[in-house]
Amino acid sequence: ICDKHGILLIFDEVITGWGRTGSKFGAHEFGVTPDIMTMAKATTNGVVPMGVVACNDYIYDAVMDSSPMGSVELFHGYTYSGIPVAVAAALAVQDIFEKEDIFNRAKNLAPYFQKGLFSLQDLESVDNIRGYGMMGGIDMKLNTKPGKAGYECFKACYEAGVNFKATGDCLIIAPQFICEEKHIDEIIDKLRT
């Protein structure tokens, strides 16, 4: 549809990239090729910050053809440019992804995680659950004020040894790809209590 109407398709794969959906990228999972794609976080496994913008030849050529001769490709600034340790970390992570077949591991574990995640739908404190692959969101029913229910659940789980992100009253669950079913069971059990 985007190609037919001359619309650029941009995928933000900062969270969904590098296996979180069960495929290397969410775009692959849905069989589309974006014109521009952003990546970060798992690019270096979060060891050091690194962000990436990838684009198709059409976009690249348009930028470079309108840039002064000798310009740096898709220049972003000095703060995040040319950090050798970030590149080394990214290359090491990519090597591990391949050698340990991490994407297939995530793809195989995802149905078990999703089943556990959606088993929480019957809890009185849960308003809505959504998930895909190795990620999920749980909207808590509002307590006395916005953010309180999410924070209380986050704090109780953290004290019980399960760490995740709470944004307002939404719990964001994204288990590590190296976890096992017993770890997912532990996460779900602690969320349930």
What label would you give each PLM region?
Residues 1-193:
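Conserved N-terminal phosphate-binding loop of PLP-dependent enzymes in the Aspartate aminotransferase
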